[in-house]
Amino acid sequence: MTKMKCAIIGSGNIGTDLMIKLLKGSDTLELAAVVGIDPASEGLAMARERGVATTHEGIEGLRKLPAYPEIGIAFDATSAYAHKEHDAALQADGKLVVDLTPAAIGPFFVPPVGGVLDSEIRNVNMVTCGGQATIPIVAAVSRVTPVHYAEIVASVSSRSAGPGTRANIDEFTRTTAQAIEIVGGAGRGRAIIILNPAEPPMIMRDTIFTLTDQVDEDAIRASVKEMVETVQAYVPGYRLKQEVQFERFGSNRPLKIPGYGEFVGLKTSVFLEVEGAGDYLPKYSGNLDIMTAAAKAAGERLAQQRLEKVAA
């Protein structure tokens, strides 16, 4: 099958892990370039060792590479601030963009929830690591019954949080909360991230709370289980930490939530852990692994749709 050439902008943890995933194999994507800004970057050195074109001159360096005219998709694994400049340049050159930063210029995309991408879409946003891990669960509850409120808490090892992640904390919470509503289907969303300094490092753990009307608990339990299996198809280390828990609140004992008010109905609690595949990053970095796995899936879907359109 014909493949679409792609580039990765950002040679840090996320960019390098994505590089390894793409080089391990893809039916629709061929990695043609890796871009950084540090000539001594380990990610750039690994790319060169594997025969991939590199530049340490950022987006302008990418545009000067001989392979650039043939590149159809660029993955941006830098920062929300830098992405705005990168997107403008890439759009001007007719490239498709998969945004792994919280910039959220384009529509959100979560593989097991998002469907066919509109042919006019030029930029898709991968939300955040916490969003990729938790939004599928919110969506799993939403397909059973309307979710009035959803709150997620993502706890990740501080070792897995590089400078890009730390610089984007505010964007993380805003973007994730917004995507919980838009993609997950919640009436209102809230997101919290915790950088866990524990040693040895803990794997990613996520807690998802949803508030709904009183419904069949077995239906929610089955929907969550099915969604977990769907995510495991591309993130094998994604799993339930324990059984789904339920708590009912009546008018005589409503649940009080700051900033939301009183709630009467069913509270569903889902506890997850995400272990990384260990492609480049340590297995405790499941937060980064789910992001790169989802980005690869998004890029492959974009490439497949464009290649099919050209062949038609």
Curated annotation (Swiss-Prot):
GO molecular function terms attached to this record = acetaldehyde dehydrogenase (acetylating) activity; NAD binding
The protein's annotated catalytic reaction(s) are: acetaldehyde + NAD(+) + CoA = acetyl-CoA + NADH + H(+)
Indicate whether Oxidoreductase appears among the record's keywords: yes
Recorded hits in Pfam families, A to Z, give: AcetDehyd-dimer, GFO_IDH_MocA
Query: What top-level branch of life does the organism fall under?
Result: Bacteria
Chain residues that bind NAD(+)? S11, G12, N13, I14, S160, A161, G162, P163, G164, T165, R166, A167, N168, N287
Listed GO biological process terms: catabolic process
CDD domains listed in its UniProt record: ALDH_C
Q: Where is the active site?
A: C129
Record-listed E.C. numbers: 1.2.1.10
Question: Which EC main class describes this enzyme?
Answer: oxidoreductase
Keyword set for this entry?
Aromatic hydrocarbons catabolism, NAD, Oxidoreductase
Q: What HAMAP family would the database entry show?
A: Ac_ald_DH_ac
In which family does this protein belong, per the annotation?
Answer: Belongs to the acetaldehyde dehydrogenase family.
Instruction: Output this protein's name.
Output: Acetaldehyde dehydrogenase
